[in-house]
């Protein structure tokens, strides 16, 4: 049986933690930032964890994570 392929786009976006959860960065924080409030940009700053609803999909994309 051939090796499973890792989804390279997902590999660049998600990192697995020691507890098995996946962390990633918020979107909407790359450009066109002048119209966004300081509060909104600050809240988008820290990393967040993938929800339980999406966890199965991320695991399927990253078989060796």
From Swiss-Prot:
<dbReference type="GO" id="GO:0006412">
    <property type="term" value="P:translation"/>
</dbReference>
<keyword id="KW-0689">Ribosomal protein</keyword>
<comment type="similarity">
    <text>Belongs to the bacterial ribosomal protein bL35 family.</text>
</comment>
<dbReference type="InterPro" id="IPR018265">
    <property type="entry name" value="Ribosomal_bL35_CS"/>
</dbReference>
<protein>
    <recommendedName>
        <fullName>Large ribosomal subunit protein bL35</fullName>
    </recommendedName>
</protein>
<dbReference type="Pfam" id="PF01632">
    <property type="entry name" value="Ribosomal_L35p"/>
</dbReference>
<dbReference type="InterPro" id="IPR021137">
    <property type="entry name" value="Ribosomal_bL35-like"/>
</dbReference>
<dbReference type="GO" id="GO:0022625">
    <property type="term" value="C:cytosolic large ribosomal subunit"/>
</dbReference>
<keyword id="KW-0687">Ribonucleoprotein</keyword>
<dbReference type="GO" id="GO:0003735">
    <property type="term" value="F:structural constituent of ribosome"/>
</dbReference>
<dbReference type="InterPro" id="IPR001706">
    <property type="entry name" value="Ribosomal_bL35"/>
</dbReference>
<dbReference type="InterPro" id="IPR037229">
    <property type="entry name" value="Ribosomal_bL35_sf"/>
</dbReference>
């Amino acid at each position: 049986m051939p090796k499973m392929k890792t989804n390279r786009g997902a590999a660049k976006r998600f990192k697995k933690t020691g507890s098995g959860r996946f962390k990633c960065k918020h979107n909407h924080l790359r450009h066109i930032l002048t119209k966004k409030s300081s509060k909104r940009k600050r809240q988008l700053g820290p990393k967040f964890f993938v929800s339980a609803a999406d966890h199965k999909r991320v695991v399927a994309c990253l078989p060796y994570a």
